[in-house]
Amino acid sequence: MDKTIWIKADKGHWEAHKDRITTGLESGANCVLVNSDEVEKVRELGDIQVAAFTYDDKSGADIVVVGKGGEGDGTKPLSPDPVGSLDMITAIRLKEKGLTVGAYVVIQNKKYEEFAAEIGKECDFLIIVGTDWKVIPLENLIAALQDSDVKIIAGVRDQDEAKLALETMEHGSEGVLLDSDDPNTIKATVAVAERSGIEDLKLVPGKVTKVEAVGMGDRVCVDTCNMMTKGEGMLVGSQASGMFLVHSESEESPYVASRPFRVNAGAVHAYVKVGDRTRYLSELSSGDEVTIVNAGGKQRTGIVGRVKIERRPLMLVEAEVNGEIIKNILQNAETIKLVDINGEPISVADLKPGNEVMVYYEGGARHFGMKVEETIIEK
């Protein structure tokens, strides 16, 4: 599940928090929380989801949030009975009007935690901000609301608090509300959210058994909107059950300038790993997501900027892993590289039987890109 980053920008006048909104937009934040009179100003800055503190349906925000200036933030005393809470009544009324509703609660003590658990059952989002706590109330609320259709957004001040919130009780909050003016903190927190919940892949050594030129064919070059570094590339193979880590063109070469956004991935028939699924290389197009993987198995999402399919001389590479042979067909050129067991790129022109390269092997078959349990032989 993707984790989301909200930027809190409701204090002071517009110019005081415009910069943090702009930084959030540029860094890839998902939502901005502002006062109701600033919704349109945010929309003028860029395309981002807007949440607004309000008690009516006139703001035009994507998400209306109750609690500021009410019981949620402690401005007004809590009602002895949550059912009689003005925030609760307002949230229900706005939901009945078909709006997406959030509740904002500052957890000052146990009673506020209990109030948050109750109002959360009536809302689409529950935004909780701590005073002197780190984990326990969040754990309690995740447990209390696990059967409710509400997304918990935890207030944080930096990337370390964000990481803690997003990983609490394995599931973590669905997102965080960041309250910071520091551009570096905003960027680092967005990066934490992008990595959160994405498990490392287990890459293993595969022993090369064959390297053979196979003639001319069509190969796919994937130019992404992302800069890759040494050790990064994409998992590509002729079988979905076993894929080679094909290195990006991030290394300098005497033959051509580096292209750190590019992976010369393989022939048109090949599979490429995208999240938990696979796709054919030849299906990729601008705007599609791909998975960038490094030699240690860490994953991140990339965006396809362009795909080039061109006729080139090809080379078959086979490797043995777990007693099985896996294959890939790559362009026969010095700049096309796999990754050795030390995380170093190795050119297919230098590849020989007996070399060990990093591969991803899981066995099993695929049906429309999804893993299924069935007997299948791919040669």
Swiss-Prot record:
It catalyses: 2-amino-2,3,7-trideoxy-D-lyxo-hept-6-ulosonate + NAD(+) + H2O = 3-dehydroquinate + NH4(+) + NADH + H(+). It is an enzyme of class 1 (oxidoreductase). Its EC number is 1.4.1.24. InterPro entries: DHQ_synth. Keywords: Amino-acid biosynthesis, Aromatic amino acid biosynthesis, NAD, Oxidoreductase. One of its GO terms (molecular function) is 3-dehydroquinate synthase activity. One of its GO terms (biological process) is amino acid biosynthetic process. Pfam families: DHQS. It comes from the Archaea. Catalyzes the oxidative deamination and cyclization of 2-amino-3,7-dideoxy-D-threo-hept-6-ulosonic acid (ADH) to yield 3-dehydroquinate (DHQ), which is fed into the canonical shikimic pathway of aromatic amino acid biosynthesis. Belongs to the archaeal-type DHQ synthase family. This is 3-dehydroquinate synthase. It comes from Methanococcoides burtonii (strain DSM 6242 / NBRC 107633 / OCM 468 / ACE-M). The gene is aroB'.
